[in-house]
Amino acid sequence: MKALRNYLDKIKPNFEEGGKFHAFQSVFDGFETFLFVPSKTAKTGTHIHDAIDSKRIMSIVVISLVPALLFGMYNVGYQHFTHTGATGSFFEMFIYGFLAVLPKIIVSYVVGLGIEFIVAQWKKEEIQEGFLVSGILIPMIVPVDCPLWILAVATAFSVIFAKEVFGGTGMNIFNVALITRAFLFFAYPTKMSGDAVWVSGDTIFGMGQAVDGLTVATPLGLAATTGTVPEFSMDMVTGLIPGSIGETSVIAILIGAVILLWTGVASWKTMISVFVGGAFMAWVFNAIGMENNTMAQMPWYEHLVLGGFCFGAVFMATDPVTSARTERSEEHTSELQSPS
C-alpha cells in the first residue's frame, strides 16, 4: 500500500487546479479517498471531531451485511438444488449462489457509482462513499431471478431521483435501496412477486439442473394463496426458505446487528422499537380475530422472522442518512415503521 500511496502522491498534482487532468479531479479524489483516509479535517466551526468518518461508517455497514449476503448466496444454491432435484455439496451450492448473485452486485455498483461519478464531475464536487452501502443492499433485497437490465434501470432511477436531485449523499430524504425496491415492485411486479422468481431454474457453468417454469412459493406467498397459516419452523430462523437474496436468515441478520450496535453505527433503540412495534401490531390483529385474513391470524413471532421484517429493522430503519437522530424521534419513527 505504501508503493500505491507514493504513486498517487506523485500523480496527484496532475489532477489539482492547473494540472492537465484537472477536469477529472473529483474522480481522482474519490479513488484516493476510497483507498486511504482523507488528509484534510475540519478545524473550526461547529464540526464534531470523532475517530470515525463517513467512509468508516459505510465500511462498517458493508461488513455487517456480509453474513447475510454470504448466507443468501448459499441459500440461492440450496433452493435451486433442493427444488430441481439436482445433487450437490455445500461448496457447490455456495458457488452456484455466488455466481448467480455476483452479476447483480456488479450491475448495482457499476450503474450507481457510474451515475455518482458523472454527477460529481458535472458539479465539480468530491465523490462520496454513500453508494458503498446502497450498492450491496440493492442486490440483497431482490429475487434471484430479477433480470439484470431491470435491476440496472431501477438502480439508475433511485440514484437519480431519490438521491442526486436532493443534493447527493447526506441530503437525500429517501432510502435509495427502498426506492429501488418500490420502483421494481410497481414497475415490474411480475419480476418481484409470484411463485416463479424466488428460485433459479438455470444452470451456471454446468452446475445445477435447468428446469423450465420452476415455481416455488415463499411461506407468506403460500399463506396468501392457500389461506393456511404457515407452521413455525427453524428454517424460518436459519433462512433456508425461498425469499429475496439477503433477507431470509434471521441469524445472519442478527450477527450484522451485533456489529452495528457494537461499533455504535446503529441505535439499539431504533431496532428494538421496530421489533416491539411489529410484535404489538401483530398481537393486535391476532386479538381482533380476522377469520378471513390469513396474515392477521399468523402468530406475532412469525411476522418478525418472515417477509424481510428482520432485515428492514436492522439495516433499513437504521440507515445513517434517512433514519431519525434524536432519542425520542428514534423511538416514535421506528414504532411507525414497524406496522408497515
Where in this protein do the model-derived segments appear?
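N-terminal signal-anchor module of multipass membrane proteins
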Residues: 1-105
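C-terminal ends of transmembrane helices
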Residues: 42-48, 112-124, 160-170, 255-263, ...
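Structural signature of hydrophobic alpha-helical transmembrane segments
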Residues: 94-110, 145-154, 236, 240-250, ...
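Membrane-interface helix-loop-helix junctions at boundaries between adjacent transmembrane segments
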Residues: 126-207
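Generic transmembrane alpha-helix motif of multi-pass integral membrane proteins
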Residues: 134-144, 254-260, 311-316
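Long hydrophobic alpha-helical segments that form multi-pass transmembrane helix bundles
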Residues: 170-254
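A beta-strand-loop signature enriched in Asp, Gly, Thr, and Trp
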Residues: 271-327
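Residue-level detector of conserved catalytic or cofactor/ligand-binding positions
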Residues: 328-339
